[in-house]
């Protein structure tokens, strides 16, 4: 029972790991002894975040930038990760959103969101299955954690007509993948975050992407009276990645301060 929540020595890939929720999870993994790869579309940002996280938390944080909205980028990332001998944890966090009024909502916006949030998750998981299969055992399965959203459970507040739909699809994809892979010692679950101080939420509430804004107006509307913290999301990801979470399969777990429960 002593090491129930240990991820010491595990190898993890966190997509969308250069900022926001992905960065929070990557930081939590590093602080608890995992070797972490982070990926994002912008190489300079990804490199800078990996360097900063490694300096702050120690361990090994490796930047592997790629665009995961298309198969070329997915294949390139899988090839980079395959240079390691195995992969214990895959966090599919890379995501996109697009906001326009319904009468103006474009095919470009629809496809960008669906390609990144649904198709990209499936095909990256597919390409990394050999490594995940190699790492997983009956006692300590490999883990896939898909980052969904409460907007895939309840109606969202913004004119992002493909975002919530993509996350609802991701939640169902999580169940399908979990049923398919559980007997191969690969466990798949999803986390549905609520409000966290991220670039994406900041753009939606008029903050222009600045994460250092006053979040109290958002936090005050939350049942817990605040927005989420890195400890909240990283703690849940660590649970799902550790021995403690080895019997939790195919679930979408909200991390939202009670928003969905109170809606």
Predicted feature descriptions by range:
Residues 2-4, 238, 243, 249-263:
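Short C-terminal tail/terminal secondary-structure segment
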Residues 11, 18-19:
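Conserved glycine-rich cofactor-binding loop
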Residues 101-102, 106-114, 218:
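Substrate-binding pocket helix/loop in short-chain dehydrogenase/reductase
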Residues 130, 179-180, 246:
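Alpha-helical segment proximal to the catalytic Tyr-Lys
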Residues 137-169, 174-183, 195:
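Catalytic loop of short-chain dehydrogenase/reductase
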Residues 182, 187, 248-250:
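Short, small/polar-rich loop/turn modules that mediate ligand/substrate recognition or access, typified
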Residues 193-203:
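Short, flexible catalytic-loop segment of classical short-chain dehydrogenase/reductase
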């Amino acid at each position: 029972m002593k090491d129930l929540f240990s991820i010491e020595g595990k190898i993890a890939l966190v997509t969308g790991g250069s900022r926001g929720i992905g960065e929070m999870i990557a930081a939590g993994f590093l602080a608890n002894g995992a070797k972490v790869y982070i990926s994002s579309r912008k190489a300079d940002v990804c490199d800078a975040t990996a360097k900063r996280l490694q300096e702050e938390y120690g361990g090994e944080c490796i930047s592997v930038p790629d665009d995961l909205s298309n198969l070329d980028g997915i294949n390139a990332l899988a090839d980079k990760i395959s240079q390691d001998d195995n992969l214990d944890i895959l966090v599919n966090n890379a995501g996109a959103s697009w906001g326009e009024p319904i009468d103006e909502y474009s095919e470009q916006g629809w496809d960008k969101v669906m390609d990144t949030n649904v198709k990209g998750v499936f095909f990256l998981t597919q390409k990394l299955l050999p490594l995940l299969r190699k790492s997983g055992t009956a006692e300590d399965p490999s883990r896939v954690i898909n980052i969904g959203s409460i907007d895939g459970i309840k109606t969202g507040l913004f004119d992002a007509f493909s975002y919530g739909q993509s996350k609802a699809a991701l939640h169902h994809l999580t169940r399908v993948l979990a049923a398919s892979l559980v007997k191969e010692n690969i466990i798949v679950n999803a986390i549905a975050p609520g409000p966290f101080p991220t670039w994406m939420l900041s753009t939606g509430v008029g903050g222009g992407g600045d994460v250092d804004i006053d979040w109290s107006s958002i936090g005050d509307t939350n049942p817990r009276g605040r927005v989420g913290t890195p400890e909240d999301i990283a703690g849940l990801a660590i649970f799902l990645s550790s021995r403690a979470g080895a019997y939790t399969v195919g679930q979408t777990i909200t991390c939202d301060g009670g928003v969905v429960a109170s809606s």
